[in-house]
Amino acid sequence: MTDADFAEQLKDLDTTLRNIESVLDIDRLRADKARLEEAASAPDLWDDQARAQQVTSQLSYVNGEITKLTDLRSRLDDTQVLLELAEAESDPGVLTEVAAEITGLAKSIDEMEVRTLLSGEYDSREALVAIRAGAGGVDAADFAEMLLRMYLRWAERHGYPTEVYETSYAEEAGLKSATFTVKVPYAYGTLSVESGTHRLVRISPFDNQGRRQTSFAGVEVLPVVEQTDHIDIPENEMRTDVYRSSGPGGQSVNTTDSAVRITHIPTGIVVTCQNEKSQLQNKASALRVLQARLLERKRQEEQAKLQGLKTDAAGSWGDQMRSYVLHPYQMVKDLRTEQETGSPSSVFDGELDAFIEAGIRWRKQQQLSGDNV
């Protein structure tokens, strides 16, 4: 590849990065940083713990975005200088270094560009993720627990704070269901492409005959409700039941009735929370989950009205979107984007970025196709 080719590649990368800087508005991010730093330094910040956690979480996220953008700009400028040096000295060794830098830059800028595709009404929200075991008995419950760990590890890899609201354990092993939040801006826009039915194929560790088992689990991603959403639920529309928290195998893990189940009478939606020690805390968490489900229901109804379709609130649960095959071969494959890997262990350890980024791009293409119909 010639010097001119490298120069053209760098020019294209510079154009892409300038577009990203414009869309993400780095000047606004810097202004947000100053505002959040001022809020974080307030002496009474921790008088309201929920507010304090929100401020520190947002500040961490904004700092991360600014660092990514400034690092990319610095790397691009340094590579341009390196290319000029290679041209001046006619040094093939330096050109090899330039080629490697351009390859790395292209990958990093491509990953950052995905953020510019998150422009939906609720994409900037924090995310509430619900996982439910589906068909497959104990293997499905075990799969649900594997998915919970996978998403928590993904968040941990990125330094995103999470909070587990509810884990309902199955009798033999695994989880019937789990609900948690990812507390950073744009978590909903990022993770919403994970909604759907996930499928696991493996030799069951719970089958004495060592037979292959197919099991399913559903993932539902909702935007966290904010005050501006005005999701107010009258007390007479809710039935609240309390019970003792249970752990693996159905054993009781609390001597008081601290777990809470809320039923929304008009819709039949049921939410539970048992991870907090206090009944009041569990009720508050369960109410947040219920509000998120009602907001999603409202969003689906509005979308269906625009499209002239009948709302199917459970539709996403029936959409099989990814297979995890551990036997007779090893592969994870997204059925929408064709993204795949031969390393299921790394995926279950939270290496999801390639799948999520492909999902976001696929969703954007679907939206554009729909607009053109």
From Swiss-Prot:
Pfam family name, one: PCRF
Modification after translation, per record: Methylated by PrmC. Methylation increases the termination efficiency of RF2.
N5-methylglutamine, modified sites: Q251
Alphabetic keyword roster: Cytoplasm, Methylation, Protein biosynthesis
Compartments (UniProt record): Cytoplasm
Top-level taxon: Bacteria
Gene Ontology annotations for the cellular component aspect, listed alphabetically: cytoplasm
Cytoplasm keyword on record: yes
One GO MF term attached to the UniProt entry: translation release factor activity, codon specific
Ligase among keywords: no
Record-stated family: Belongs to the prokaryotic/mitochondrial release factor family.
Function of the molecule: Peptide chain release factor 2 directs the termination of translation in response to the peptide chain termination codons UGA and UAA.
Protein name: Peptide chain release factor 2
Source taxonomy: Bacteria, Bacillati, Actinomycetota, Actinomycetes, Micromonosporales
Annotated gene: prfB
